[in-house]
């Protein structure tokens, strides 16, 4: 079992947290992490690209000249693909790039990136993040007290609305819950700031 220091939101040590090795202490599987990141990035693509084929281009309903007798090549429409201003052949159409990986693969990737952050001492555990109202300045003080000045992913327990609202407007800060934190978010952050309740939830889901 790995132990990490537990801090309060004033930056003082409040003990230790014992992490479940089945979640936070495995050998990271880089291949699986790569596959999941590619999948998540594909899901973020809009896929709204579109061009007009010959049936979608306006005009071109009349045959431009008669079939025979002009000496020119026969043509049926000025919107045929070989014409300037004509339709595009096999062009891109709106589509979804999303695809799903097996649940076991996604869970292994999450455990891999969590374990990597713990091994690199980039995992900061805090007993709680409680605010009486959404206050961005107050959350900035918490980060300063914990000496966090890089890109950070804040992982909260469900229902901690004030903390989420306090953090989301800060630069280089992204907020997620224990069940919504993605592999892509974790890899893109320099540090993780995780509440004790969120750690328990992560272990419950992934162990």
Curated annotation (Swiss-Prot):
Cellular-component GO terms for this entry: ribonucleoprotein complex; ribosome
Chain spans, region Disordered: 49-78
Record key words, sorted: Ribonucleoprotein, Ribosomal protein, RNA-binding, rRNA-binding
Single GO term (MF): rRNA binding
One example of a Gene Ontology biological process annotation: translation
SUPFAM superfamilies noted in UniProt: Ribosomal protein L4 (SSF52166)
Pfam family, one: Ribosomal_L4
Keyword field contains rRNA-binding: yes
Domain of life of the native organism: Bacteria
Record family assignment: Belongs to the universal ribosomal protein uL4 family.
Identification of the protein by name: Large ribosomal subunit protein uL4
Organism encoding this protein: Streptococcus sanguinis (strain SK36)
Gene name in the database record: rplD
